[in-house]
């Protein structure tokens, strides 16, 4: 199995849930918008690779974070309930594994997969793929990014 770069991002600060009847519709606060814009600057400054695919929940706060963090890029986005707060991180991981197996058109570079999602599942995914990094980054705060290079993706179960 080839090496894959995995970037895990927790959405930026969102409006209080009591203001919305539907949790999936919560939007970023002004602070959250600044945090997501900072993620974009950080991505560029650190040369975090452009994703081949982005997995996300489709929840408004994750979508807004994704749009600002990856501003100006043409992206393949997969929206799935397993990347939501109520989703199954194990099923989400299987989707990531399936994507990691898909061949790239340019064989001379590493595949890069981004996940823009929610806790507790972002923390669970991080713990699954790198318990050491997870221990350092716990709690995985809003508008945080973890950039991992996974040499043997299949071994992370």
List the predicted regions and their residue ranges.
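Active-site-proximal alpha-helix that buttresses catalytic centers in soluble enzyme cores
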Residues: 2-83, 87, 136, 140-143
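Glycine-rich phosphate-binding loop signature in dinucleotide/nucleotide-binding domains
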Residues: 46-49, 99-111
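Hydrophobic packing residues within well-ordered alpha-helices of enzyme cores
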Residues: 65-69, 92, 125-126
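Long, internal stretches of domain cores in catalytic or enzyme-like folds
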Residues: 75-80, 93, 105-106
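Short phosphate-binding loop-to-helix
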Residues: 84-100
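A glycine-rich beta-strand to alpha-helix segment
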Residues: 107-128
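Domain-level recognition of soluble alpha/beta enzyme cores
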Residues: 133-157
